[in-house]
């Protein structure tokens, strides 16, 4: 009986202790921040993986699969290369005088005229591509003593033999081929591009039958340059039934300069000039289809959005494009440090502040208050601190994009086989640039993430310190982001603390009085735990004693018999 009385006393003593919200003369106010059940891991300067409530992917890793035809003017080369369209290959006649922002060459493109080579193919291709036009002006060259408009069965235009429409094949007239000397001044205010060529017969007999002389010569010059080409007579691999070749050359004549052409044979003469323009047109090899859509950035894989600062779709781009990096993902923190809320808050449902964990379910703000008082519990967001954090984070993505997006195109680099060492060097330089940009991108994102997390933590601390300064000695910091308020604080009082109109002096006397009364009888939480554990142990011990006594009594009365066999 004495034991039962003692246990009852202990139980009543435990239940009689003050817990947050149980006493009408006190209240608990906690400050906290938004949290989500599953956050996003980002990298910072000091931490390789830190969880935040929200993050934005910065690397565009996929394309639309098609090249958008807006806002850039796309010219689909179909089965023509740009050089074939430039020369006037019969199957490319549809490209005459075309213009473009981006000329798209296809892998299925082919030549269907006299076999030729361009010693400086990459330079000519790049020059014409950047000009963005095939606008051609015929000029009245006078070729005296020779036959013009030569053709070949390898270059049919319809059923008849033909030739490149922008070139004029000259050969002997009768049995003579006189020395040609023609001049053409540039009296306009723009650069003119002249395309010309030299014919290389496959045999000496072909040479004399076309040009009379056993060896011809072609010299093309301006005030700034001169090119002299001697034909190389000899058989080459057969292409479209021919073992002879044409070498294509080009000359730019500046305003006020003069084009001079001198030849005694083998000349493939120009018919006029291409009007050169300056701009940011380009060329790209791609088999992606042309689609009706809008995109500022184009890659060989297709168009990509440029709303991210980085991309790893393709190194070759045209337009305002994200910077190419090696990383598949770089996440920019756009939310605060995430500390998911603990689902269990103990037997008495105590609330906790930001130092212990975040709060899930705060949909109207990033920072806020929770309270327990005589009127129950409640939660409200602090819009001012929330807006302060959002204002500083907003625009962060745009600032990163402004730092990284290229407002120009990254063209393809091409070199002939004899320029192999230059090509290797160029590849090394490009790879080094990509490595540097990839490192810079990762560092930039890590710095921004560190700043975001420090910023959001700072706003939380500012709000906590602001609340502490209001309450002063009327409340006690509980160490977990909460304050125990030592006076009756109804919902209106809590609201005044939140909006900064709390009057400390009004509650000062009541708070001091309650603090001294409560402190005088308050048991520390450690003693409460010990009392609970001791009372539980004693109860278990008494239960065992009663059960053992009952068994012994039953055995003595004969109601229970125990046999032990050996």
Curated annotation (Swiss-Prot):
Subcellular localization: Virion membrane; Host apical cell membrane
Stored SUPFAM superfamilies: Influenza hemagglutinin (stalk) (SSF58064), Viral protein domain (SSF49818)
Q: How does it sit in the membrane?
A: Single-pass type I membrane protein
InterPro entries linked to this entry:
Capsid_hemagglutn (IPR008980), Hemagglutn_HA1_a/b_dom_sf (IPR013828), Hemagglutn_influenz_A (IPR000149), Hemagglutn_influenz_A/B (IPR001364)
Gene Ontology terms for molecular function? host cell surface receptor binding
According to the record, the segments passing through the membrane are 531-551
Q: Which UniProt keywords apply?
A: Clathrin- and caveolin-independent endocytosis of virus by host, Clathrin-mediated endocytosis of virus by host, Disulfide bond, Fusion of virus membrane with host endosomal membrane, Fusion of virus membrane with host membrane, Glycoprotein, Hemagglutinin, Host cell membrane, Host membrane, Host-virus interaction, Lipoprotein, Membrane, Palmitate, Signal, Transmembrane, Transmembrane helix, Viral attachment to host cell, Viral envelope protein, Viral penetration into host cytoplasm, Virion, Virus endocytosis by host, Virus entry into host cell
HAMAP family in the cross-refs:
INFV_HEMA
Subunit structure comment from the entry: Homotrimer of disulfide-linked HA1-HA2.
> What is the protein's name according to its record?
Hemagglutinin
């Amino acid at each position: 009986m004495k034991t039962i009385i003692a246990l009852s006393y202990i139980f009543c003593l435990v239940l009689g202790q003050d817990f947050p919200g149980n006493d009408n003369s006190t209240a608990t106010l906690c400050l906290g921040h938004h949290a989500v059940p599953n956050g996003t891991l980002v990298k910072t300067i000091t931490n390789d993986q830190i969880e935040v409530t929200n993050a934005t992917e910065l690397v565009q890793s996929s394309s639309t699969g098609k090249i958008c035809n807006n806002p850039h003017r796309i010219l689909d080369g179909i089965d023509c290369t740009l050089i074939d369209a430039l020369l006037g290959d019969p199957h490319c006649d549809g490209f005459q005088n075309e213009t473009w922002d981006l000329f798209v060459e296809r892998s299925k493109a082919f030549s269907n005229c006299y076999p030729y080579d361009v010693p400086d193919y990459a330079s000519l291709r790049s020059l014409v591509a950047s000009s963005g036009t095939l606008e051609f002006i015929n000029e009245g060259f006078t070729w005296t003593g020779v036959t013009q408009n030569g053709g070949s069965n390898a270059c049919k235009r319809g059923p008849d033999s033909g030739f490149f429409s922008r070139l004029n094949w000259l050969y002997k007239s009768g049995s003579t081929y006189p020395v040609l000397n023609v001049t053409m001044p540039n009296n306009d205010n723009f650069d003119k591009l002249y395309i010309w060529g030299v014919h290389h017969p496959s045999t000496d007999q072909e040479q004399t039958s076309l040009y009379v002389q056993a060896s011809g010569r072609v010299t093309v010059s301006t005030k700034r340059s001169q090119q002299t080409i001697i034909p190389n007579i000899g058989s080459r691999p057969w292409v479209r039934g021919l073992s002879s070749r044409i070498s294509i050359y080009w000359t730019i004549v500046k305003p006020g300069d003069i084009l001079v052409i001198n030849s005694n044979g083998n000349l493939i003469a120009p018919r006029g000039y291409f009007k050169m323009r300056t701009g940011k047109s380009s060329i790209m090899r791609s088999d992606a289809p042309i689609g009706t859509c809008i995109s500022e950035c184009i890659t060989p894989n297709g168009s990509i959005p440029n709303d991210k600062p980085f991309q790893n779709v393709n190194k070759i781009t045209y337009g305002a494009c994200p910077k190419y990096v090696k990383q598949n993902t770089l996440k920019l923190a756009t939310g605060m440090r995430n500390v998911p809320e603990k689902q269990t808050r103990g037997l008495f449902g105590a609330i906790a502040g930001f130092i212990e964990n975040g709060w899930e379910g705060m949909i109207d703000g990033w920072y806020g208050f929770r309270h327990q008082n005589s009127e129950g519990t409640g939660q409200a967001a602090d819009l001012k601190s929330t807006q302060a954090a959002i204002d500083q984070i907003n625009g962060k993505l745009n600032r990163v994009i402004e730092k990284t997006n290229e407002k120009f195109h990254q063209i393809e680099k091409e070199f002939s086989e004899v320029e192999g060492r230059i090509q290797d060097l160029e590849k090394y330089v490009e790879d080094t640039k990509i490595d540097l940009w990839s490192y810079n991108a990762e560092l930039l994102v890590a710095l921004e993430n560190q700043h975001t997390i420090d910023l959001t933590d700072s706003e939380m601390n500012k709000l906590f310190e602001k609340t502490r300064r209001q309450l002063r000695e009327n409340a006690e910091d509980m160490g977990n982001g909460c304050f125990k308020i030592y006076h009756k604080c109804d919902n209106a009082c809590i609201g005044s603390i939140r909006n900064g109109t709390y009057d400390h002096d009004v509650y000062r006397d009541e708070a001091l009085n309650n603090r001294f009364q409560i402190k005088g009888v308050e048991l520390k939480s450690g003693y409460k735990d010990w009392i609970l554990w001791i009372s539980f142990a004693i109860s278990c011990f008494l239960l065992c004693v009663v059960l053992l006594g009952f068994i012994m009594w039953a055995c003595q009365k004969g109601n229970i018999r125990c046999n032990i066999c050996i």
